[in-house]
Amino acid sequence: MKSEIFSGTIPALMTPCKADRSPDFDALVAKAKELVGLGMSAVVYCGSMGDWPLLTTEQRMEGVERLVKAGIKVVVGTGAVNTATAAAIAAHAEKVGAHGLMVIPRLLSRGTVVAAQRAHFKAVLSAAPTLPAVIYNSPYYGYSTKADLFFQLRAEHKNLVGFKEFGGYADLSYAAEAITGADADLKLMIGVDTAVYHGYVNCNADGAITGIG
């Protein structure tokens, strides 16, 4: 599978709230339209910027659906406290017409166990087989996805088309050399705003998923 969704600058949206602390989806859509109008290629919702742990699954799904209905290209974050919820979010994203997935590792239980992460990634990727996806790698999750696991997953899930790296310069260089540099069809997305120059100039990155939303 090839996809052009993972290119250019893709801001991760925050979740605006009303006075009663419920999500303000009208404001969410308005901000997405503003950013796309300024030249952003798409938006991400819900990544960590969107405060997904504070939202219900239904609220997250509503936000995605509202963005899609507004004609916004949206990449959906799959962070969740369990694999079943992450897979349900991915399946919903595919159903309503989202454009891609940002697949978050297993977080709370056995996060350092490679077999557990493999099973988690497989479940999420299988739930939305037509949606292009990148794995989100972050040292803050306590687990790093390495090339061997990435290519095991890619061999079975053609919708895995790239890698977002949130670590520092060394992590981004590793991703470029060992993962995306090994296959010209793979996309490398910069995940740290301060590493944008390094990512584009030294790592041949395709785009950046940034915290400017």
Q: What role is predicted for each listed range?
A:
Residues A123-P129, S138-G213:
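Catalytic alpha/beta core domains of metabolic enzymes, predominantly
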Residues K2-S144, Q152:
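Active-site beta->alpha loop and helix N-cap motifs at the rims of alpha/beta catalytic domains
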